[in-house]
């Protein structure tokens, strides 16, 4: 029976990237990577900075610079939701998913849809090979719909 090779960890991939690009392997960069891969869901730079202060003090500039490096290394994904500050999420170990974004409160909810995924996978692009996709659906969440209904009924 053939043993499957295990996937390299985010830390191993990051180390390879830093060596390949001749970047310094600083403890701050590794601490930021570790924090990102220890939390679930989306985060922004300022929120990550706040999280880092509990364990490993880094400057906000270091957070932003490291996010740029992690983006280039394909270890995180950046989302820009309708005028909000950039949101990030880890790229490894997460399933392909879509996002519904409330235009009233800004709440972001992830969802999966097999039909959308299959349609993207089946699509053949001329001179292009897709590696991943992002789909954002904008609208009003149930909570905000309910609030609006209550306000309208009180008028």
PLM region spans:
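Short amphipathic alpha-helical elements of helix-turn-helix/winged-helix folds
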Residues: 17, 34-39, 73
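Short helix-capping/hinge SLiMs at alpha-helix to coil transitions
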Residues: 23, 37-40, 54
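Short acidic, hydrophobic short linear motifs in intrinsically disordered regions
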Residues: 43-50
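Non-DNA-binding regulatory cores of transcription-related proteins
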Residues: 73-155
